[in-house]
Amino acid sequence: MKTFLASLAALLPVVALAHDYSVNDLMVMHPVAKETTATARSSAGYFTITNNGDAADRLIGVEADFPRVMMHNTVVQDGVASMRHMDAVILEPGQTVTFEPGGFHVMFMGLSEPMTEGEEIPATLIFENAGRLDIVFKVEKIEAKDHSDHNH
């Protein structure tokens, strides 16, 4: 019994860090938003989506309590990176799509105060077929250059 309890206790930090969500055959894993500076007017959100089903679906929107929330993709053309608005992200059967720095990401725009480490940002992902999925972005410290200081 002691071995079982010790094993269970060892897993608790991992379980506490994991925050996954699912709707139908879609799994959304580890949504995070990056901590911002005091003057930042936007921040980026990241997560991974896996379609475990037999049919394609599309992520067609993200809602959160900010003046504007948009899906973007970073595109590099002639050595210059730019953000392109995405109306939808296609999720083929068996496919995993990662929203990450330098690729797909969610922009939270019009911040009135900084996002701070440990804060939780409620949001809703809207899928064409699976419908709405409420998730929570956990705010983490800035570890690498991201889009926190972009003004769109």
Per-range role (PLM):
Residues M1-F4:
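Positively charged n-region of N-terminal signal peptides that target proteins for export
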Residues H19-H152:
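Compact, glycine-rich, soluble single-domain proteins
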Residues P13-V15:
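N-terminal signal peptide c-region/cleavage motif recognized by signal peptidases
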Residues A9-A10:
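Hydrophobic alpha-helical transmembrane segments of integral membrane proteins
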